[in-house]
Curated annotation (Swiss-Prot):
This is Endoglucanase 2. Its EC number is 3.2.1.4. Residues 1-34 form the signal peptide. The gene is GLU5. GO terms for cellular component: extracellular region. It comes from Oryza sativa subsp. japonica (Rice).
Length: 640
């Protein structure tokens, strides 16, 4: 369990005010190497998403790309009379912990909400959406009744006693449940946040599924709010692994914020505002964001609502949230008067030895999001007689942290497995460190794994591609040893926020013009458009262009039907790259489609006789329905 993220080590000093003064932007302490193309953010993005396939539990799909994994946990929930097959293992072990899993899915969804266009341009949006759905499908199973949530499968104590592949595990698979007699407002609230955020991702491509997720979210929020309590008081076996040190106030606010964004229902904005003081949203100044402490995320979401003009009569309260968001940014930048995040000599944000990188990736994502929504504005800091930090400075600092992770550090080590020339070879991970069951099908027992595999010298036999490990200590030192779990264990919540900022950086480092996707999401429509309307301003437009027009209309049974012709073109210059694996999403469609084939999991693909689009070429399809034009967009592709 690469946890180490409890609030026990978090500075929670109440921040009473932020002075309004100006300080000229000082040069960064460390200039990252990636500004001129030193890092391949697109490759890192692809790997960061690929890692989640190594963490899958359940029946693996035909699209599985991590070939050394196989089916596992196929009886999960059976003893409890419920199907709990699926979901994700949290880190290097075989337990399904609900709190970090839900936070992981929330952050994956937020990454797509903010940077889905950029992921599509990199050809990774389809993989990102698939990773989200793997989690939400499991949560739907784990929430069989409005006031019941299965919070964990397996337990850390028995799991840590064994070193086994997930395909072989003989450890306890007991399922632990929350209900009115055994409440868990923190875990139910985080799961509500995950389902609400994910509903935005699927709103246009799969509206029925989005509705289901939103319904789960609303029920879970009501359950969390009505039956209050810490989940680790109800499920004590979780306490030593993912204890809820910060309590549940942050998750209740977090869930209400996501429900407001997903539904536009003012009740959730009212909750966010009316409970701002009582639940700590405008009281706590915190510079750490992760699976336990959600306050900075809530504060930046609330600031985003304010900046978008969605605060309504609660603008004053949301200003209080924004001041705390400013504190978080200033503390990361080292510009607060009293409470700045520490840094290593090499410039990495530093909180703790155990899995410190989780806080680096989450902070970098929050800073990038805040930067993009400031729209040329600035945050106001209280340090050094007063200072401001512009949006560009926030993004530049976030980029420096990502560059550090990818290898721009004193050791020249990439902390993403499989990226760069030097990266961890002995990740603390059961499945990666034991020969694949496909290559060596002989059963590996509980203790045999420790005797034969755990202590082996040399690299793991299976590449944990894309995994971001815990990272170096406060001196930038790192020991690539399997038993050094504080530094070499990766976790899903390390990667989830990194997906978003890698997509942002892959598209460019300058100011981001928010096109159709951003506008749609502000209205609760998660349409992953990469083909923007004519005249839309977007710095990093996709080479794939979509045009549609009505070609015929007729009356039948009192209704007017329209035939629409859609052309999909590769606008790359002559001799340029070919578009392959093109996936198309269609929303608000109420009739048949000709000229496309249904994709395996969602959306559409080009027909088998047109598998690719060379530069300058086009493909066409038509649809008929009695409605205005459908929403048509690109959800993913590869340029080769």
């Amino acid at each position: 369990m690469a946890r180490g993220g409890g609030a026990a080590g978090v500075s929670m000093a109440h921040h009473l005010g932020i002075a309004l003064v100006v300080l000229v932007f000082a040069a960064m302490a460390q200039v990252a190497r990636g500004g001129g193309g030193g890092h391949d953010y697109g490759m890192a993005l692809s790997k960061s998403i690929l890692y989640f396939e190594a963490q899958r539990s359940g029946v693996l799909p035909g699209s599985q790309r991590i070939a050394w994994r196989a089916n596992s946990g196929l009886a999960d929930g059976k003893a409890n009379g419920v199907d709990l097959v699926g979901g994700y293992y949290d880190a290097g072990d075989n337990v399904k912990f609900g709190l970090p899993m839900a936070f992981t899915v929330t952050m994956m969804a937020w990454s797509v909400i903010e940077y889905g266009e950029e992921m599509a341009a990199a050809g990774e949006l389809g993989h990102a959406v698939e990773a989200i759905k793997w989690g939400t499908d499991y949560f739907a199973k784990a929430h069989p009744e409005p006031n019941v949530l299965y919070a964990e499968v397996g337990d850390g104590d028995s799991d840590h006693n064994c070193w086994q592949r997930p395909e072989d595990m003989t450890t306890s698979r007991q399922a632990y449940r929350l209900d009115p007699q055994n409440p868990g407002s923190d875990l139910a609230g985080e799961t509500a946040a995950a389902m609400a955020a994910a509903s935005l991702v699927f709103r246009s491509s799969n509206p029925g599924y989005a509705d289901q997720l939103l319904q789960h979210s609303k029920q879970l929020f009501d359950f969390a709010d009505k039956y209050r309590g810490r989940y680790d008081n109800s499920i004590t076996v979780a306490r030593n692994y993912y204890g809820s040190f910060s309590g549940y106030g942050d998750e209740l606010l977090w869930a209400s914020a996501w429900l407001y964004q997903a539904s536009d229902d003012r009740r959730y904005l009212d909750y966010l505002a009316n409970n701002a003081d009582a639940l700590g949203g405008t009281g706590w100044s915190i510079n750490q964001f992760g699976w336990d402490v959600k306050y900075p995320g809530v504060q930046i979401l609330a600031a985003k609502f304010l900046l978008q003009g969605k605060a309504g009569e609660h603008a004053g309260v949301l200003q209080g949230y924004r001041r705390k968001a400013d504190f978080f940014a200033c503390s990361c930048l080292g510009k607060d008067a009293a409470d700045n995040v520490g840094r290593t000599p090499g410039g990495m944000l530093y909180h703790q030895r155990w899995n410190n990188i989780q806080f680096v990736t989450s902070a970098s994502f929050l800073l990038a999001v805040y930067s993009d929504h400031l729209a040329g504005g600035a945050v106001r800091c209280s340090g050094g007689g007063g200072a401001v930090a512009g949006a560009a400075e926030l993004l530049a600092f976030a980029k420096s942290q990502v560059d550090y992770i990818l290898g721009s550090n004193p050791r020249g080590t990439s902390y993403m497995v499989g990226y760069g020339a030097v990266y961890p070879r002995q990740a603390h991970h059961r499945g990666s460190s034991i020969a694949s069951i496909r290559a060596s099908p002989s059963f590996v027992s509980c203790r045999e794994g420790y005797a034969s595999w755990y202590g082996r010298r040399g690299g793991n036999p299976n590449l944990l591609d894309g995994a971001v490990v815990g990272g170096p200590d406060e001196h930038d030192d790192f020991a690539d040893e399997r038993n050094n779990y504080e530094q070499t264990e990766a976790a899903t919540y390390n990667n989830a926020p990194l997906m978003g900022i890698l997509a942002r950086l892959a598209a460019g480092h300058g100011a981001r013009a928010r096109g159709r996707l951003g506008q749609s999401l502000q209205h609760g429509i998660a349409a992953n458009h990469t083909s923007l309307p004519h005249g839309a301003n977007h710095q990093h437009a996709s080479p794939v262009e979509i045009e549609q027009k009505a070609t015929a209309s007729w009356e039948k049974d009192g209704r007017t039907y329209h035939r629409y012709a859609v052309t999909v073109s590769n606008r790359s210059p002559a001799g340029g790259k070919t578009v392959e694996e093109l996936h198309i999403g269609i929303g608000k469609l109420y009739g048949p489609v000709w000229g496309l084939e249904k994709a395996a999991r969602y959306g559409y693909v080009l027909p088998s006789w047109t598998p690719s689009l060379p530069a300058g070429e086009s493909a066409a399809f038509v649809y008929v329905h009695a409605a205005p034009p459908a929403d048509v967009w690109v959800t993913g592709y590869k340029l080769v």
